[in-house]
């Protein structure tokens, strides 16, 4: 038996789940809903989101409403048995929540009730969590507060970045949807209520929240840089210039200079922090490519006044 499925999502993590649904024999993928086009290249050509590109490549019906409520009637006419969402980016109104026979199942990239919100992967790293994971949950009007259906965890280490963790969680999401799909379309699936006393939040990263504060311990700065990679990328300010920082390493050298002081030693760049110096391993000056300090310092040294 095939079930009529609609999918809501936009970025790469959602595309990997969409691809899995597209290839499942039990799924009749009737339509996809994604965010409106929002990114453009230097020539002002539209850059399609991963989900939109997949839909175009595979001739899948696609909606891109400014507000999901705009297409409530179209969704009602399509009559999905179940709607699956992943990193969609819009609140879903109650009218749409009530449409599918087997409800809306959201794929959330944290171990709920921890880290409700739009940036759970970033904050799992920022908060120093030792593990995170994927939660399949029923969608209700309150953000990420529905009953937990299934969860699976994975470990985080000091080298984990948002980019690497997103890929791991995307693959885990796809695996869980494949394994649990037939359970998701059972009418008696209720799940477990979330413990409201254990709730924490991971709101979207805002402009200027990616600026490094070197008046912090080195371990936190390392964590911060990892959390901001590869989007939006950590920024350090130097003489009024914003320098992107992709990768750092904590040293054993106690910081003797004022936090934020840049030091050059044998074609290496170090920055003092609250406790230990950190080494800058990969950085990017404005309008330049990301470079190692060794390559950068072989040219004109931007760190000498």
From Swiss-Prot:
* One family name in Pfam for this protein: Formyl_trans_C
Reaction catalysed by this chain?
L-methionyl-tRNA(fMet) + (6R)-10-formyltetrahydrofolate = N-formyl-L-methionyl-tRNA(fMet) + (6S)-5,6,7,8-tetrahydrofolate + H(+)
The keyword Transmembrane is assigned to this record: no
User: Binding positions for (6S)-5,6,7,8-tetrahydrofolate?
Assistant: 110-113
What cellular-component terms does GO give this entry? cytosol
Q: What is this protein called?
A: Methionyl-tRNA formyltransferase
E.C. number(s) listed in UniProt: 2.1.2.9
List the HAMAP family. Formyl_trans
Task: Write out the GO MF terms.
Answer: methionyl-tRNA formyltransferase activity
Gene of this entry: fmt
Q: What does this protein do?
A: Attaches a formyl group to the free amino group of methionyl-tRNA(fMet). The formyl group appears to play a dual role in the initiator identity of N-formylmethionyl-tRNA by promoting its recognition by IF2 and preventing the misappropriation of this tRNA by the elongation apparatus.
Organism from which the protein derives: Ureaplasma parvum serovar 3 (strain ATCC 700970)
Q: What domain of life is recorded for the organism?
A: Bacteria
- Give the family, as the similarity comment puts it: Belongs to the Fmt family.
Q: Does the keyword Transmembrane apply?
A: no
Top class in the EC scheme: transferase
InterPro entries in alphabetical order = Fmt, Formyl_trans_C, Formyl_transf_N, Formyl_transf_N_sf, Formyl_transferase-like_C_sf, Met-tRNA-FMT_C, Met-tRNA-FMT_N
Q: Which UniProt keywords apply?
A: Protein biosynthesis, Transferase
| NCBIfam families for this protein | fmt
Matching CDD domains, A to Z? FMT_core_Met-tRNA-FMT_N, Met_tRNA_FMT_C
């Amino acid at each position: 038996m095939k079930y009529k499925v609609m999918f809501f999502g936009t970025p790469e993590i959602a595309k990997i789940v969409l691809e899995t649904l597209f290839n499942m024999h039990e799924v009749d993928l009737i339509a996809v809903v994604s965010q409106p086009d929002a990114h453009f290249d230097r020539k002002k050509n539209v850059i399609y989101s991963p989900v939109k590109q997949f839909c175009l490549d595979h001739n899948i019906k696609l909606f891109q409403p400014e507000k999901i409520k705009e297409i409530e009637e179209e969704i009602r006419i399509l009559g999905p048995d179940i709607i699956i969402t992943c990193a969609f980016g819009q609140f879903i109104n109650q009218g749409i929540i009530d449409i599918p026979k087997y409800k809306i199942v959201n794929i959330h990239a944290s171990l709920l009730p921890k880290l409700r919100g739009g940036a759970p992967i970033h904050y799992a790293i920022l908060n120093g969590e030792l593990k995170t994971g994927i939660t399949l949950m029923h969608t209700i009007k309150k953000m990420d507060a529905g009953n937990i259906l299934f969860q699976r965890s994975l470990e985080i280490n000091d080298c984990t970045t948002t980019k690497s963790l997103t890929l791991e969680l995307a693959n885990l999401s796809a695996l869980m949807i494949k394994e649990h799909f037939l359970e998701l379309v059972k009418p008696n699936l209720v799940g477990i209520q979330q413990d409201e006393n254990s709730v924490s939040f991971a709101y979207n990263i805002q402009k200027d929240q990616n600026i490094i504060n070197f008046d912090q311990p080195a371990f936190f700065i390392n964590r911060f840089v990892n959390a901001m990679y590869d989007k939006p990328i950590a920024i350090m300010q130097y003489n009024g210039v914003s320098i992107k920082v992709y990768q750092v390493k904590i040293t054993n050298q106690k910081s003797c200079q004022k936090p934020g002081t840049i030091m050059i030693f044998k074609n290496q760049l170090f920055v003092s922090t609250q406790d230990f110096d950190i080494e800058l391993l990969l950085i990017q000056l404005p309008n330049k490519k990301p470079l190692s300090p060794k390559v950068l310092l072989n040219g004109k040294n931007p760190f000498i006044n």
